[in-house]
From Swiss-Prot:
ATP binds at residues 32-39. It catalyses: 1,6-anhydro-N-acetyl-beta-muramate + ATP + H2O = N-acetyl-D-muramate 6-phosphate + ADP + H(+). CDD domains: ASKHA_NBD_ANMK. The keyword Kinase applies. It comes from Psychrobacter cryohalolentis (strain ATCC BAA-1226 / DSM 17306 / VKM B-2378 / K5). Keywords: ATP-binding, Carbohydrate metabolism, Kinase, Nucleotide-binding, Transferase. One of its GO terms (biological process) is amino sugar metabolic process. InterPro entries: Anhydro_N_Ac-Mur_kinase, ATPase_NBD. This is Anhydro-N-acetylmuramic acid kinase.
Length: 427
């Protein structure tokens, strides 16, 4: 590229994107492994905000997936899962075609969610700098060096009139990382404080933790902490399954999509020998950094484990509610065991929970039982409702991308270096 063309491109970028960072509006979008719908937030970041919270959520919107799209997404998440679909005359008949169909449908649905959010908040699309759209993970294979998030950002940019940042994970993987978890970098930027270590526990489809060490007072005084590149001293990784298995088992045995408040699980009894068997999964023996997903923990895996258990323990009787209680305990024990590694050696006295699992009262109670050294509460006590944390995180990651700042934490993902994440599709 010659100097003239490069200068022209640089000027265009500065005029269209790299401006008004101090008070920029961003939209973050997230649909997790639990596939319960799309969350979207409109938020404002400010480098000039000297408060403890240089981010403000202005509006939120959540919308369930159309039933057919959700069905196809769930099928795509499973190897050969698409074979269970019965296509109509105008629908695809191969897995690759279904992937393209779902990518388009997902993007059109995402566009509708964004436009509804803009309408409800009376916000002009021209005032929004970018959308951070994670897309839907249909395959995460860090051991093979790839992760696939399904979304067509071109459609979203065209239908909303807003530039879109997507495909966040693969740049981290290009430098040797696992591409996950990415949210701990945001946790560090927003929630770290100078006087104590904090632990953030995200309970989405998969559970993951972020251990945030106390930041230096020099950074706090200079107001560099929240907006500069996050520190590699953060520890973060996936700890195991959460809502993914809980929701799948609930859907299979009840007429509900999820166990509201954990009341069904609470009505059952933990099957200790089954719990011990589930904890033998190889993932729990791995050291961090590590990540997992539906490829490791899914309904087929659970049913296979139950079959093995029944064959080995024919005299043990249990109900479907007992299995739900056991799955809840699996999440609580696998997460708390990792958190306790850091609580015991730190000054932290609180674990802040976010994600849909934060609304599961029974799970929160079980976490508190296993985390006796600290108080378990939600991120609402830090000023951000737990169900919106991940969506805000991807708004923040989009902002990092447009600012040319790194968005990954090598100590968390295992990458060889910090890199600017994502690809930008301009409106």
């Amino acid at each position: 590229m010659d100097d003239l063309n490069y200068a022209t491109l640089t000027d265009a970028l500065e005029q269209t994107v790299f401006e008004n960072f101090d008070d920029g509006l961003y939209i973050g979008m997230m649909s997790g492994t639990s596939l319960d719908g799309m969350d979207a937030v409109l938020c404002q970041f400010s480098e000039k905000d000297n408060t403890q919270q240089p981010m403000h959520v202005l509006a939120t919107h959540s919308q369930d997936f159309p039933p057919r799209l959700r069905e196809v997404l769930l099928a795509l998440c499973q190897p050969n899962g698409i074979q269970a679909l019965t296509p109509s005359d105008d629908e695809p008949n191969s897995e690759l075609d279904w992937f393209g169909w779902a990518s388009k449908e997902y993007a059109e649905f995402s566009s509708d969610v964004v436009n509804t959010l803009l309408q409800q908040s009376n916000t002009d699309s021209e005032s929004v700098l970018a959308i951070g759209c994670h897309g839907q993970t249909v395959r995460h294979r860090p051991q093979m060096g790839f992760s696939l998030q399904l979304v067509d950002a071109n459609i979203i940019a065209e239908r909303t009139g807003i530039s879109v940042v997507s495909d966040f994970r693969r740049r981290d993987m290009a430098v040797g990382g696992q591409g996950a978890p990415l949210v701990p970098a945001f946790h560090q930027a927003l929630f770290a404080v100078p006087d104590s270590t904090r632990v953030l526990l995200n309970l989405g489809g998969i559970a993951n933790i972020a251990v945030l060490p106390a930041i230096s007072n020099d950074l706090v005084d200079s107001n560099e902490h929240s907006e500069n590149q996050p520190s590699d001293s953060v520890v973060g990784y996936d700890t195991g399954p959460a809502n993914l298995l809980l929701d799948a088992w609930t859907t299979l045995h009840t007429d509900k999509d999820y166990d509201a408040g954990g009341t069904w699980a609470q009505s059952g009894q933990v099957v200790e020998p089954l719990l011990n068997q589930l904890l033998e999964h190889p993932f729990f023996k791995k050291t961090y950094p590590k990540s997992t997903g539906r490829e490791d923990f899914n309904l087929a895996w659970l049913q296979d484990e139950l079959q093995k258990f029944d064959q080995a323990s024919a005299d043990v009787r249990y109900s479907s509610a007992d299995v739900q209680a056991t799955l809840t305990e699996l999440t609580a024990i696998s997460a708390s065991a990792q958190i306790n590694l850091f609580i015991n050696a730190s000054s932290s006295n609180a674990v802040y929970v976010c994600g849909g699992g934060a609304l599961n009262n029974y799970l929160m109670t079980r976490l508190q039982v296993h985390l006796q050294r600290c108080k378990v509460e939600t991120t609402a006590s830090l000023g951000l409702e737990p169900t919106w944390v991940e969506a805000v995180a991807f708004a923040w990651l989009a902002r990092q991308t447009l600012m040319g700042e790194t968005g990954n934490l090598p100590a968390v993902t295992g990458a060889s270096k910090g890199v600017v994440l994502g690809q930008v599709c301009f409106a």
